[in-house]
Amino acid sequence: MNGKYRGRGFGQGRFQSWKSGRGGRGFSGKWREREHRPDLNKATGKHPEQTPQSLLLQSTLDHFIPYKGWKLYFSEVYSDSIPFIEKIEAFESFFTERIELYDKDEIERKGSILVDFKELINDDEIIKLIPNIANELRDTPEKTLACMGLAIHQVLTKDLERHAAELQAQEGLSRNGETVVNVPHIHARVYNYEPLTQLKNVRANYYGKYIALRGTVVRVSNTKPLCTKMAFLCAACGEIQSLSLPDGKYNLPTKCPVPACRGKSFTALRSSPLTVTMDWQSIKIQELMSDDQREAGRIPRTIECELVHDLVDSCVPGDTVTITGVVKVSNAEEANSVSNNKGQKTKASEDGCKHGALMEFSLKDLYAIQEIQSEENLFKLIVNSLCPVIFGHELVKAGLALALFGGSQKYADDKNRIPIRGDPHVLVVGDPGLGKSQMLQAVCSVAPRGVYVCGNTTTTSGLTVTLSKDSSSGDFALEAGALVLGDQGICGIDEFDKMGNQHQALLEAMEQQSISLAKAGMVCSLPARTSIIAAANPVGGHYNKAKTVSENLKMGSALLSRFDLVFILLDTPNEDHDHLLSEHVIAIRAGKQRAVSSATVARMNSQDSNTSILEVVSDKPLSERLKVVPGETIDPIPHQLLRKYIGYSRQYVYPRLSTEAAQILQNFYLELRKQSQRLSSSPITTRQLESLIRLTEARARLELREEATKEDAEDIVEIMKYSMLGTYSDEFGNLDFERSQHGSGMSNRSAAKRFISALNKIAERTYNNLFQFHQLQQIAKELNIQVADFENFIGSLNDQGYLLKKGPKVYQLQTM
């Protein structure tokens, strides 16, 4: 007994106490008591006759508690003198008045009820019984929410018992005792809570307080079970007890509940009915940066939030949410409710009590929106309010304004159809110094939801979705990129030509409006319903009109064809335009509102007086109508108000095409098809027709109209023609329809075809597909192929895959 069993406490502890009855370690009391008192129950350590009496006493106490689910919400023993009994009675009367407004089956299924905070603080009964309800909810949220939960639990129990009694009375059944009604634990979810707390103000003094936050979801973890109560088995006497685990933190019991047992060793029973688990999820919220909250040089703050029970899976990365909950010390907030402010229905808004909205509008905002809509020439006002610092480029600004308003998405909720995107994409290409970046920043600033990124500092995962590993649990979680964060808004990408291989990540997001991810065993799809507005500089610093847009940007045709509008900005010298531009810049720098001087007005008026009356056209083109007439003053709409106007139109206006507008768009599309077939250029597809429809709907939405008219379609056709004029024209100013509509493909297409055909014949005849550079020059000279730069011509054939460079001045033909 000395060696093997001494360390296990057998020889000196348990064996000794059993044999002689003198105190072994940890077992002496119980064994001695059993030895001298054989009437004790060996399993529980209690008298056999005491057990049913104590159970009877306990059931009698439970019978006297007027609230059926008291133990589900409070650990205290019920007493009439408990101070929060009055609160429960007040909430009970509040819910009793509104019980018919709630879906009782839905409340039981989800285990939660939505409570409007504004209704709560304006209720007369609540004000009379709990005058400082707002302060009590803020300072003691757990007790107040538990009182609400118990009140609705009591109301539902009484209602179900009444229905059961009525049903029994109708069927003529005799009532043998009371009807047993089992209502689950119900959580009170408060929404519309005020005031909203900014993330920068969440400090230590908010610990344990009830607050409301608003932000963007940037990371969502997997759903896990969180243990709130664990059953433990005493190794000494076999007694089972249930221990509460606050916040899911594992803890062992300190003693056995049996008074006579002194056992200190316990085993966790994970499969016991007494073990209670709940769904748990962690999300990361990033603050929304509005104009009055921007802080230079500071990255946006984030906070971790925990979602439990029915709030799990109520949002995805990129959603804008309002979260109310209790601040905890572990740098996280336990959410009490999640209001997902998106167009789609979520867990928090399925009941119909609150449907998420993109923006909220006060009465003052609505009056301002009505005043803007009543303007006579609204399109001109909005175009000139977009970026007043940049002079001219009215049609480019018009295209950007239409992208801000966007068209209507079709079949978004129909699972049997593929949705058709309503967000137009715009690309602005041009020489440096023409204000592309300023226009892009202005658009992102005006948009209700805008994300601005720069192409040369952006990665593929930064644009789309990142799969990161959670440091605490080791699980993978999704972190949203720029396109997902710009969902139902604008994503502005500057330096678009310097993105490298990141272009491929945009293809799915631009057409399917979603981002699919398959990494580390996780396969999912996130919404990215955003308009992409990009600005790019051409290769070499200057736009070469002898090349196509694709050759100027080194960009594939698959990406270019997804842009609805491609604008080419060229820095061409023009005396009148340069004079106006210089005066505009000087006036802006001087801080004047009027950018055109009186001398310019006099000069322009003298020019207008010499114009023949025969040259005056009553129906001015759109480019003329959008220009500010000399002598005319325009008061631009402030960006803060314009943002509200755009948000209102995107939220409430869904225009449709009239018959005349559809006919104009169809005629223009058919004419494009006819030209593409006749001149063997790149095909015009239905993608161009959908672009025309989207932009026409945006033109009607800009004026808050439900129907797009004939004039809207004519304006869009003019903007589209202006866009195509830049992509089709060559270095001589002629329209080369052999180029594709969006400038993809090659310049000198017919010359390239003849050249490659001649190389094929020579290679077949000589059985050699390698050519020296001087040989290629000689062949081009014999074919009389006139190109401005022969090296660029061969380089474009190399880019298109016709020729492969095998060494210095040596090329291999790839089309044999």
UniProtKB/Swiss-Prot annotation:
One function term, GO molecular function aspect: ATP hydrolysis activity
Superkingdom of origin organism: Eukaryota
Location of the MCM domain: 378-585
PTM sites of type Phosphoserine: S606
Summary of the function given for this chain in its UniProt record: Component of the MCM8-MCM9 complex, a complex involved in the repair of double-stranded DNA breaks (DBSs) and DNA interstrand cross-links (ICLs) by homologous recombination (HR). Required for DNA resection by the MRE11-RAD50-NBN/NBS1 (MRN) complex by recruiting the MRN complex to the repair site and by promoting the complex nuclease activity. Probably by regulating the localization of the MNR complex, indirectly regulates the recruitment of downstream effector RAD51 to DNA damage sites including DBSs and ICLs. The MCM8-MCM9 complex is dispensable for DNA replication and S phase progression.
Places the protein is found: Nucleus; Chromosome
Keywords from the named record: ATP-binding, Cell cycle, Chromosome, DNA damage, DNA repair, DNA replication, DNA-binding, Helicase, Hydrolase, Nucleotide-binding, Nucleus, Phosphoprotein
Chief subcellular location: nucleus
Gene3D superfamilies linked: 2.20.28.10, Nucleic acid-binding proteins, P-loop containing nucleotide triphosphate hydrolases
Family from the record: Belongs to the MCM family.
Subunit structure comment from the entry: Component of the MCM8-MCM9 complex, which forms a hexamer composed of MCM8 and MCM9. Interacts with the DNA mismatch repair (MMR) complex composed at least of MSH2, MSH3, MSH6, PMS1 and MLH1. Interacts with RAD51; the interaction recruits RAD51 to DNA damage sites. Interacts with the MRN complex composed of MRE11, RAD50 and NBN/NBS1. Interacts with CDC6 and ORC2. Interacts with HROB; the interaction recruits the MCM8-MCM9 complex to DNA damage sites.
Catalytic function, reaction form: ATP + H2O = ADP + phosphate + H(+)
InterPro entries: AAA+_ATPase, MCM, MCM8/REC_WHD, MCM_dom, MCM_lid, MCM_OB, NA-bd_OB-fold, P-loop_NTPase
Species name: Bos taurus
Any single biological process term in GO: DNA replication
Biased composition (Basic and acidic residues): 30-40
GO terms under cellular component: chromosome; MCM complex; MCM8-MCM9 complex; nucleus
Protein name, entry field: DNA helicase MCM8
Residues annotated for ATP binding in this entry: G430, D431, P432, G433, L434, G435, K436, S437
Region listing for Disordered, in residue ranges: 1-52
Pfam families: MCM (PF00493), MCM_lid (PF17855), MCM_OB (PF17207), WHD_MCM8 (PF25051)
EC number, UniProt record: 3.6.4.12
